[in-house]
Amino acid sequence: MALAYDPLFITSDKSLSAFDVASSPPQPMNLTQDELKRIAAYKAVEFVESGMVLGLGTGSTAKHAVDRIGELLRQGKLENIVGIPTSKKTQEQALSLGIPLSDLDAHPVIDLSIDGADEVDPFLNLVKGRGGSLLREKMIEGASKKFVVIVDDSKMVKHIGGSKLALPVEIVPFCWKFTAEKLRSLLEGYGCEANLRLGEKGKAFVTDNGNYIVDMHVEEDMGDLGAVSDAILRLPGVVEHGMFLDMASTVIIAGELGVKIKNKH
């Protein structure tokens, strides 16, 4: 069932002191994390218009957005939508909902992508890919005119790596230990640990592209993220990393006090 949210609780980054459009302080809505994710996702789908080519994200938050798009198509409120899925899982979901699908070869420019994130810093830089789909996500969202990110407020951090959770790096399987050690050594100054991601039965997790993922855990602020990004990508064996720098157009943040919208300036 669709969740309602009070428009008085929606703010923009013109005033980041939060929820100052309400005449009195809003009361906490006491919602679960999944309900907050759904609220953010439904708000993001308001950006969708008939005739658009859409990048369809992957993960627990993006799933709600894909569900909503399918619902609006069934209701006839959206028409002539084409979806570009960022993973096999999202592809299966979209097909089950009757969303027409295509790919970047047929649609190299995407009107709008909607996806979740694992971290969002004050400059709207992101960590993504803890679900394992970072390469396709970055290809599709990087080809988008507008990229809307949907999160609950637990994903907001002071700096990338601030959650102490993983920064994923996709690598080729060949001599993965060699590549993982190079990554660890590269970020050693930030207190880095590098661990191969494991999947079922303790075997290496394999991405949709047939690659492995090394999860990087850093203890300190990495500072110049652009320089760190370049250094990671220069390592032979690295395919892509999960830092999405200067890519988000808008971030929609759902919390117990309502929904907040931040736009890239």
Curated annotation (Swiss-Prot):
Extract the HAMAP family matched here.
Answer: Rib_5P_isom_A
Say where the protein is mainly found: cytoplasm
Signal peptide extent: none
Broad class of enzyme this protein falls into:
isomerase
Q: Which organism is it from?
A: Arabidopsis thaliana
**Its encoding gene is what?**
RPI2
Q: What is this protein called?
A: Probable ribose-5-phosphate isomerase 2
| Enzymatic reactions | aldehydo-D-ribose 5-phosphate = D-ribulose 5-phosphate
Superkingdom, according to UniProt?
Eukaryota
In which family does this protein belong, per the annotation? Belongs to the ribose 5-phosphate isomerase family.
Question: Which EC numbers does the record give?
Answer: 5.3.1.6
Asked whether the UniProt record includes Isomerase among its keywords, one would answer yes
- Identify the keywords attached in UniProt to this record, alphabetized: Acetylation, Cytoplasm, Isomerase, Phosphoprotein
